[in-house]
UniProtKB/Swiss-Prot annotation:
InterPro entries linked: GPCR_Rhodpsn, GPCR_Rhodpsn_7TM, Melcrt_ACTH_rcpt, MSH_rcpt
Annotated protein name in UniProt: Melanocyte-stimulating hormone receptor
Keyword Membrane found: yes
Top-level taxonomic group: Eukaryota
Length: 317
């Protein structure tokens, strides 16, 4: 993912000498001030990436193997898993190449490394964009299933879902290529930030509206059966907790990365911003963690998918 020069480690690794860094400590910024820097060990980063990779591969395989899961909803979930898989895989590849170059185990010309860096950046950026898009698509799909339940199967058909999936992938690859080519322009970074905020607002509005409808439905059932108000309050609290977790994880995992991009535009030389820039690898790690959490939220809660996954694992043994 293109950011400022210090983060483009792949090309710089040709002439770099690895130095030991603490996992958590104080580092000096450009003005000599002390700032907090969290260093993520490469082993931990690769381990998290591997967990995400395996987890999302299992989701894709389970959905592909079970024809009962070939529905629009699971189509979006499968594509989300594929996007998260690419996010993890591309970052793992980037880190692995860096380590091999720094150790001298891989010899390559600067031009070759630059091309490889560009390819990895495009894959990473496009998979991030598609991951955000599919999170939004899942929210829209759930919204339609609740507010237009009787017309859902005529509105959200498998053909339309496939068209949406194709459009998301094509747009993600196209825009990520443009973003990488013009990564030095502030407008490009601001476009990415605005896109993230748009997805955040879209998901928040849709899920809050769905929560309000669920509370109204629970209240109607309670009145029909002459139940006490605490039952309705329990539904509201449970829904609010679920909504808080869902949006909270999304914001905490993705927010720091896009804050990083925003500060590159607003205050690239400010001492405080420089301290934040030092934690770029931490922000990437949070995105990898989101790729680990996504299957737990959107995929593994399905009993049908869990049964299919169990069969796949048993057959593999």
């Amino acid at each position: 993912m293109p950011v400022q020069g210090s983060q483009r480690r792949l090309l710089g690794s040709l002439n770099s000498t690895p130095t030991a860094t603490p996992r958590l400590g104080l580092a000096a910024n450009q003005t000599g001030a002390r700032c907090l820097e969290v260093s993520i060990p490469d082993g931990l980063f690769l381990s998290l990436g591997l967990v995400s990779l395996v987890e999302n591969v299992l989701v894709v395989v389970a959905i592909a193997r079970n024809r009962n899961l070939h529905s629009p909803m699971y189509c979006f979930i499968c594509c989300l898993a594929l996007s998260d898989l690419l996010v993890s895989g591309s970052n793992m590849l980037d880190t692995a190449v860096i380590l091999l170059l720094e150790a001298g185990a891989l010899a390559a010309r600067a031009a070759v490394v630059q091309q490889l860096d560009n390819v990895i950046d495009v894959i990473t950026c496009s998979s991030m964009l598609s991951s955000l898009c599919f999170l939004g698509a899942i929210a829209v799909d759930r919204y339609i299933s609740i507010f237009y339940a009787l017309r859902y199967h005529s509105i959200v058909t498998l053909r339309r879902a496939r068209r949406v999936v194709a459009a998301i992938w094509v747009a993600s690859i196209l825009f990520s290529t443009l973003f990488i080519a013009y990564c030095d322009h502030a407008a490009v970074l601001l476009c990415l930030v605005v896109f993230f905020l748009a997805m955040l607002v879209l998901m928040a509005v849709l899920y809050v509206h769905m929560l309000a409808r669920a509370c109204q439905h629970a209240q109607g059932i309670a009145q029909l059966h002459k139940r006490q108000r605490p039952a309705h309050q329990g539904v509201g609290l449970k829904g609010a907790a679920t909504l808080t977790i869902l949006l909270g994880i999304f914001f905490l995992c993705w927010g720091p990365f896009f804050l990083h991009l925003t500060l590159i535009v607003l205050c690239p030389q400010h001492p405080t911003c420089s301290c934040i820039f030092k934690n770029f690898n931490l922000f990437l790690t949070l995105i990898i963690c989101n790729a680990i959490i996504d299957p737990l939220i959107y995929a593994f809660r399905s009993q049908e998918l869990r049964r299919t996954l169990k069969k796949v694992l048993l057959c593999s043994w």
